Amino acid sequence: NFKLVIVGDGGTGKTTFVKRHLTGEFEKKYEPTIGVEVHPLDFFTNCGKIRFYCWDTAGQEKFGGLRDGYYIHGQCAIIMFDVTARLTYKNVPTWHRDLCRVCENIPIVLCGNKVDVKNRQVKAKQVTFHRKKNLQYYEISAKSNYNFEKPFLYLARKLAGDPNLHFVESPALAPPEVQIDLAAQQQHEAELAAAASQPLPDDDDDAFD
């Protein structure tokens, strides 16, 4: 069992993402002391069951930062931004700093959500923060279930210390609410891979000029 904290600006799709996992949604518990919903997300691996206790902020981040109680004892994390809203990516370093102040040296996945939406403001090749901080990055679409399992598989492998760990069955997910243009998305992922071999820009802002 691992405590997984999910952070990022309000409206980036954190709650939508967590709710895709149907048994976790069914068994969630509200923790009134810190105002979070905790979803137990089970994944079945070749090494047995792994449960992530997923802490969802329930929108408190709209009123400023999150209290330390949210982060304490976090064993892994997802930082989420919305590829259709540039500001949510610009705020990723702040979320990362807040997280690392309380949780040192935990595996972190950066997720760019809503890649099903046509007019992206944050292009795949503009996402460089994960390279500076040695995080894993995935493009996801919560509403279409695209890449839903990827962040959890990465974190499970890191936490288990086993790069060969794999899921042996898929969790029950809510049916897709939107369709994703897979050909276009594969093009974005190819751009992302190509960008990874380029030197990092000196300044984050120049990617958006």
Curated annotation (Swiss-Prot):
Ranges of Low complexity composition bias in the record: 187-200
Stretch list, region Disordered: 187-209
Subcellular location: Nucleus
Gene Ontology cellular component terms for the protein in this record: cytoplasm; nucleus
Disulfide bridge positions per record: none
Any one GO molecular function term: GTPase activity
Region Switch-II, annotated ranges: 59-75
Protein keywords: GTP-binding, Nucleotide-binding, Nucleus, Protein transport, Transport
GO biological process: protein import into nucleus; ribosomal subunit export from nucleus
Pfam families (UniProt xref): Ras
Region spans: Switch-I: 28-36
Residue ranges constituting the Small GTPase Ran-type domain according to the UniProt record: 1-162
Chain residues that bind GTP: 9-16, 59, 113-116, 141-143
Chief location category: nucleus
Assembly description: Found in a nuclear export complex with RanGTP, exportin and pre-miRNA.
Similarity comment: Belongs to the small GTPase superfamily. Ran family.
Physiological role: GTP-binding protein involved in nucleocytoplasmic transport. Required for the import of protein into the nucleus and also for RNA export. Involved in chromatin condensation and control of cell cycle.
UniProt-recorded name of the protein: GTP-binding nuclear protein Ran1B
Provenance organism: Lotus japonicus (Lotus corniculatus var. japonicus)
